[in-house]
Design a protein with these regions (language model features):
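FIC/Doc superfamily catalytic core
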Residues: 1-323
Length: 323
């Protein structure tokens, strides 16, 4: 395998020999082909994200809305990795004290996302921030023994339970190539590129997942990078998008599309899929905001028809619900 996306590299020798994938730096060469289909999807995704960002700034109780969306994204992203947990578990006011490892995984994702968003105010989207976020994600949960906050020093692989280097579905870059790949990715995230930021986000997510720099937690960090990059590029002013629902519902295609890039160098089919994920996710969020605004307006009308005492009781009740 030697194509636009990278090549296979033989490691060790004899019976111990195996091949890992060495990704080429971004952006792809030759450049992404801007077909009519891709341009149409790009315009649609940008339009919906702009609508979402405009609406999200006007929604009643923005902090509560974002808090719920962060929890929903954390849950769905963790479920993609096989975490067995429900939204009720996460909304439980005692979730942080829950000893259930599945709940702890999701609670840590919430902490990691909040940490990373705050850290973006003082750091660019860089490997230091990625490592710090990973450390928060893995603190005190399954995988905490796998060097949280540090890039791996050993070879990892992707496959079913009990798989080995010999029968793995995919073997990411060896440790030396991984360090080079993450250095290249850091430069790309902070460099100048004529590509639209949404296409850049697609490439960055693919490249991170392909590089798999950690021993555990790569998928969750990779999906979190999407939100962080869109916020850094001012596409989103708040984490009001949960793309993991689309990726979970299309999980097989999600993985197959990235595999196709590695095998054939066809970035375009991956970018098309990613743009569709952004469009559908943004539209879902827009509809949610519309419904919440409608409910809010109905409640305001009811509130205005109440007596002073009823209004006071209603306000206290709503404050209680929002805690």
């Amino acid at each position: 395998m030697n194509n636009r996306a990278g090549c296979l590299v033989t490691n060790l020798s004899g019976e111990m020999a195996y091949q890992s994938f060495r990704p080429n730096p971004l952006p792809p060469e030759p450049p992404i082909e801007m077909s009519n289909e891709l341009i149409a999807k790009l315009i649609d995704a940008n339009r919906r994200l702009a609508t979402l960002d405009g609406l999200s700034s006007r929604i009643p109780n923005m902090d509560l809305f974002v808090s719920m969306y962060v929890r929903k994204e954390a849950l769905l992203s963790s479920q993609i990795e096989g975490t067995q947990c429900t939204l009720d578990d996460i909304l439980n006011p005692f979730a942080e004290e829950n000893t259930n490892l599945n709940v702890s995984d999701v609670v840590n994702y919430i902490r990691a996302e909040e940490y990373a968003i705050n850290r973006l105010q003082t750091l660019p989207l860089c490997n230091r921030l990625i490592k710090e976020t990973h450390a928060v994600l893995m603190e005190g949960v399954r995988g905490q023994e796998k060097n949280p906050g540090e890039f791996r020093y050993s070879q990892n692989w992707i496959g079913g339970q009990g798989s080995t280097l010999r029968n793995a579905r995919y073997i990411p870059p060896n440790p030396e190539d991984m360090v080079d790949a993450m250095s290249d990715l850091e430069k790309y995230m902070n460099g100048e590129d004529s590509l639209d930021p949404l296409i850049q986000a697609a490439l960055i997510h693919y490249q991170f997942e392909t590089t798999h720099p950690f021993l555990d937690g790569n998928g969750r960090v990779g999906r979190l990078l999407i939100t962080l990059f869109l916020m850094e590029k001012k596409i989103l002013s708040a984490p009001s998008l949960y793309i993991s629902y689309f990726l979970k519902m299309n999980r097989v295609e999600y993985y197959d599309r990235m595999t196709q890039v590695r095998k054939t160098g066809d970035y375009e089919q991956w970018v098309l899929f990613f743009l569709q994920a952004l469009s559908d996710s943004a539209e879902d969020a827009i509809q949610t905001i519309d419904r919440l605004t409608e409910i809010h307006n109905r409640n305001v009308q009811k509130f205005n028809s109440m007596t002073k005492r009823q209004q006071t009781n209603a306000i206290n009740f709503l404050i209680y619900l929002e805690k």
